[in-house]
A protein has these predicted regions:
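Catalytic machinery of carbohydrate-active enzymes
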Residues: 1-328
């Protein structure tokens, strides 16, 4: 007797996988290809990360749970997600069921105390806490580090992707269009991100010539210059980049939608630069002390501009901008 066509067409059940994201926008952006690969392989992702991660990843439709502040609250969340996964997957406790992208001791400890079987890197004495501990690569780009974790989880290798492919939700695209309409911003504008969180080898990652470049060089291209400061960056944007259109309080999903319509972004080593590359927008990445081999923005339209012994000149950045706009 032939099988019922409806029964034959039923897809295989998706396997729950809990994923702890890292804490920086650039790191989460570089993990997107790995998350997409796991999603395509049949995993039902349950992501845990900073509050902004939900907006950043909204276009992919993955559940993103805000990372609680205390260890007790984080363990309680993990136990709840574990119980929900067990209810739909009888094999959940018999396999690697958690991906730990951070390398901190506390993240591995929380998974262990929640009774989860985590895959992560051997670092800071975490090996005994993880169900499987991998050597931590020291000279490999972050995107490749995450990609290799998926190799282990899936039991198969795959070529590295040429592009990240960050998706933008329809809601964020509509918000971006409304914002542009209010401020008279048209497609093909130039976006800058002159901010940079943290340091590299105790050195500032902010290009010192950025204010003069934004005020004197970029306007020569006849396009609107736009800056979207993050929390705590508003005063710096107004004081040093007041000649640009300043958009405050823009969430990361809307920011990504704005960048999709940009002609170009010029950025320091910072999260929005990674976002621009991730949505396919040409990026001029201005680097000083950062090591591009480990953390550069990833994509076919990325130009790295770095001095031989420090920051690049304004002329070299200007040439990169001209190349990008000519190609566009």
């Amino acid at each position: 007797m032939p099988l019922n066509p409806a029964a034959r067409a039923q897809p295989a059940p998706r396997r729950p996988l809990i994923v702890r994201l890292r804490n920086w926008v650039g790191d989460v952006t570089l993990a997107v290809p790995t998350l997409r690969r796991l999603d395509d392989a049949g995993y039902a992702l349950q992501l845990i990360g900073k509050g902004w991660a939900r907006e950043l990843l909204a276009g992919h439709g993955w559940p993103v749970h805000p990372l609680p502040k205390t260890m007790g609250e984080r363990i309680a969340l993990l136990r709840r997600l574990k119980a929900e996964a067990q209810a739909v997957d009888a094999q959940f406790n018999r396999r690697l069921n958690t991906l730990c992208l951070p390398d901190s001791f506390s993240s591995a400890l929380e998974f262990r105390l929640a009774g989860l079987r985590a895959l992560g890197h051997a670092h800071e004495g975490r090996s005994l806490l993880l169900a499987r501990a991998l050597p931590l690569p020291r000279t490999v780009h972050a995107l490749q580090v995450y990609w290799q974790m998926a190799d282990v989880l899936l039991g198969a290798t795959a070529p590295l992707p040429a592009a990240i492919g960050l998706l933008v939700s329809d809601a964020h695209r509509a918000q971006a269009q409304a914002l542009c309409a209010r401020h008279g911003i048209v497609p093909g504008s130039l976006y800058i991100c002159p901010f940079a969180g943290g340091t590299w080898a105790q050195q500032d990652k902010t290009w010192p010539d950025f204010p003069a470049f934004a005020a004197q060089v970029l306007p020569r291209h006849g396009r609107r210059v736009v800056v979207c400061p993050g929390p705590g960056e508003e005063a710096v944007a107004q004081e040093h980049f007041g000649s640009a259109t300043v958009l405050n309080d823009v969430d990361l999903g809307t920011y990504a939608a704005l960048l999709q319509e940009a002609a170009l972004m010029v950025a320091n080593d910072t999260g929005p630069g990674h976002m621009a590359a991730a949505v396919g927008t040409p990026l001029v990445s201005v680097l000083g002390p950062s090591d591009p081999a480990l953390w550069r923005a990833w994509g076919p339209a990325v130009q790295l501009v770095q001095g031989a012994a420090g920051w690049p000149t304004a002329d070299s950045v200007s040439l990169a901008v001209q190349r990008a706009l000519t190609t566009d």
